[in-house]
Swiss-Prot record:
Pfam families: GlutR_dimer, GlutR_N, Shikimate_DH. It catalyses: (S)-4-amino-5-oxopentanoate + tRNA(Glu) + NADP(+) = L-glutamyl-tRNA(Glu) + NADPH + H(+). GO terms for biological process: protoporphyrinogen IX biosynthetic process from glutamate. This is Glutamyl-tRNA reductase. The keyword Oxidoreductase applies. It is an enzyme of class 1 (oxidoreductase). The record marks 99 as: Important for activity. Its EC number is 1.2.1.70. Homodimer. Keywords: NADP, Oxidoreductase, Porphyrin biosynthesis. The gene is hemA. Catalyzes the NADPH-dependent reduction of glutamyl-tRNA(Glu) to glutamate 1-semialdehyde (GSA). It comes from Mycobacterium sp. (strain KMS).
Length: 447
């Protein structure tokens, strides 16, 4: 069984398609449940961010698994499978591992090097684990991806080179408005992105922030954190968006809502009576979009969406930092795959040791029957000698086969071992399933 990835992202599809594919936690659980109804799929999880929807699955067959995942996603977004595949990409086995490591490292983000995706990978895994839809393969893959992402961010300068989506959006806003110091902002959404937006606004010297959120208590908590930092702030529900827009210079919105939260009517009401020369920049970081497209056509209004952010030079990390990150990812992929190949041969090695132990026990029993006059001391010495000989004979080939199996293409060595020693595949599978004990080779160091 191998890992199969079916995905659509900002690199393969326009925002309109990503909007159709956007998912919340409930949608993700349904997608995984539907995928797992197929006997071809044994594990699955969904990674959904503002820029991508990816399904990672452990499948018994490539084409069959691909068909299952594609059909489920097509039904979810209301597209035909043929139309969806125009925007999709597929990665399998080693390529799927490399892709997830790159994603967790921020190398595949709209803003190269941003760190938010690492938390999104963690949440995708945590959610799948809570729903019992990941097993050993996706567990190990996800944990290693998180580790790789942390290593890339700690050992390279990609964090500084690749700014967050919010900081890039605010850079564009400042290019249009001038300094944000002393200005008024609206933050729509009081979750993690809202908190990040507020943090960047404080750094930019913003004077006043209207926090708008579906839940007023959450809006109040974020507003209070701004007040604690010396920034004037108040809290509003979504019904007050028009009021909040009235004196705003910049808006940052990222709610994860399934439909726009800022309507054209809201914008008309909020902008009525504003001086004609006063400009408003709206940073729409939502996916689907939080802002009705028609708002971009209003006089004095600039809407910055994710497609615009992707075109910004500051959204791309410095070449040297990105290259360093890619080198780390490549090395980690090689190490991970070597470990996986070695793990695959281990049950075969263990089954061989188990068979050798069974042969030894059978021969010792035969010896007991033939030489019943042997006393306990001599019988123990003979048993020790026989086991030592078997251990020494097996040690070099079993160590070597693990080394050979860890190299690319090394999966054939496990099969060769099974053929040479006529090992029963069921016995090997039993070891892999944990039904047989793992028997270590114990060499007598005194000899």
């Amino acid at each position: 069984m191998s890992v199969l990835l079916f995905g659509v992202s900002h690199r393969s599809a326009p925002v309109s398609v990503l909007e159709q594919l956007s998912t919340d936690e409930s949608d993700q659980a349904k997608i995984v449940d539907q995928v797992l109804q197929s006997s071809l799929v044994t594990e699955a999880m969904v990674l959904s961010t503002c820029n991508r929807v990816e399904v990672y699955a452990v499948v018994d067959a490539f084409h069959g698994g691909l068909s299952v995942i594609g059909q489920v996603l097509a039904e979810h977004c209301g597209m035909s499978l043929n139309d969806l595949t125009k925007y999709a990409y597929v990665r399998y086995a080693e390529a799927a591992v490399e892709h997830l490591f790159a994603v967790a490292s921020g190398l595949d983000s709209a803003v190269i090097g941003e760190q938010q995706v690492l938390g999104q990978v963690r949440r995708a895994y945590t959610s799948a684990e809570a729903n019992h839809t990941v097993g050993r393969t996706l567990h190990e893959l996800s944990q290693r991806a998180l580790s790789v992402g942390k290593r890339v961010h700690s050992e390279t300068g990609i964090d500084a080179a690749g700014a967050s989506v919010v900081s890039v959006a605010l850079d564009i806003a400042e290019a249009k408005l001038g300094s944000l110091a002393g200005r008024t902002a609206v933050v729509i959404g009081a979750g993690s992105m809202g908190a990040l937006s507020a943090k960047h606004l404080v750094r930019a010297g913003i004077e006043r922030v209207h926090v708008v959120n579906r839940s007023l208590p959450r809006a109040r908590r974020l507003a209070q954190s701004l007040l604690d930092q010396g920034v004037t702030a108040d809290a509003h529900t979504l019904d007050d968006i028009a009021h909040a827009l009235a004196d705003a210079d910049v808006v940052i919105t990222s709610t994860g809502a399934v439909r726009p939260v800022v309507s054209l009517a809201d914008a008309h009401r909020g902008l009525t009576g504003r001086p004609e020369h006063r400009r408003l920049v709206i940073c729409d970081l939502g996916m689907p979009r939080d802002v009705e497209p028609a708002i971009a056509g209003l006089p004095g209004v600039n809407v910055i969406d994710m497609e615009r952010i992707q075109r910004e030079p500051s959204a791309r990390a410095a070449a040297s930092d990105a290259d360093a990150a890619r080198s780390i990812v490549a090395a980690e992929v090689a190490n991970y795959l070597a470990g996986q190949r070695m793990a695959e041969v281990t049950p075969t090695v263990t089954a061989l040791r188990q068979r050798a132990a069974d042969v030894v026990e059978a021969e010792l029993l035969r010896l007991d029957n033939r030489l019943p006059e042997l006393d306990a001391a001599h019988r123990a010495e003979v048993a020790k000698t026989v086991r030592r000989v078997v251990d020494k004979l097996l040690h070099a080939p079993t160590v070597r086969v693990k080394q050979l199996a860890s190299a690319p293409g090394g999966d054939s060595y496990a099969e060769a071992l099974r053929e040479l020693f006529e090992l029963d595949q069921q016995a090997v599978d039993a070891v892999a399933a944990g039904e047989l004990p793992l028997l270590p080779i114990e060499l007598d160091k005194s000899e």
